[in-house]
Amino acid sequence: MLPPQFRFWLFDQMSVKTMRYVSAIPDRQAEGLTKKVYDMIREDFFRNGSLTSRSKVPELMAAIWIAGRESMLVADKVDRTSKDAICAVLSQINDCPYCEDMLVSLVHASGEHKAAEDIFGQNDLDSTDPKLRDRLEWVRAIATPGAENVPPSPFSKAQMPEILGTLLAMSDINRFSHVVMDDSPVSAPFGVKAGKALQLRLFGSELVPTRRLPLQLGRSLSLLPQADLPEDLAWAEPNPRIADAVARYAAAVEREAASVISLQVRQVVAQSLATWQGEQMPISRSWVEGDLIGLTGEDLNIARLAIVLAKAPYQVDGTLAEAVLGHERDEARFVRILAWASFVGSRRFVNLIARQSAQESSQSFTRPPIDTKQHAAELAS
């Protein structure tokens, strides 16, 4: 195992190797809120590009750290290994190779090597622990666009806020990282997938010390001010800590977005997402154009990126990102826009799951109809 100081330096350097469009504030230049967040990430996890890519807007880095730490990393009602594995599966479905590789390595770090290998190989999970297998099969079904006959949730009512918070934060990170990370820093040597699988297992062995269990509940909350929980995120209420984290996170994203995204764009995106039931989108990206009528200039570019990133993140390419980034290359502005776009898409995705879970019976179910007018009002508020 590598010496601790060198290990964390290496992790940080590797994590920004494929970063594009934005850059992370160097550790030696960090001050104020940026330094507070950097220090807490280092103490409770490890610095990596999925978090530091938002450092040009410290409040947004703090927001995603609060949401991720309190939902994903803290072992409260659900164990950390299950959440790492769930996030690995979700990252795979959301087409975020950077996130997928890091999370598969974290599953290795937990000692669940068979689960990590099954997830990486997109296998049927037969060799995975039965309890974990049920959880991963549910996530695979619930997160796959257009999925039908989704099995009942394997989580209790007390566990659901933590799981939904995990899915919200990870989906946001997936979408954001899909844009700002150009693939994974871990490559398959000579194109041999087995070689990459071995690298991820070795990387996992170096990540073992980062699994500092148990983490103090609620430690990150004070990084941002208190906020009211939006009505459509009421699924978090049964766990006050998760509700507090989600409220602060949502408020920060909306607050930072307000200075760079027009009300018209927010309304157009809200209406588009309110009619989306999680279905698979057509291969051609022309499906989005009908939702953009009446928009021009930067409003058009921002709305297009947000809607595609929400419904089909795998269809987002450099042309969409470059159109929003513009000639001025204002990284802070881009982070504000992208953080909002990633959040609203993830919010819709998780709210669909929350409503399904609330209505499910002991039988398999398909996605129920949603009151689209009500949800549009919630998203636009």
Where are these regions (language model features)?
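Hydrophobic alpha-helical segments
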Residues: M1-S381
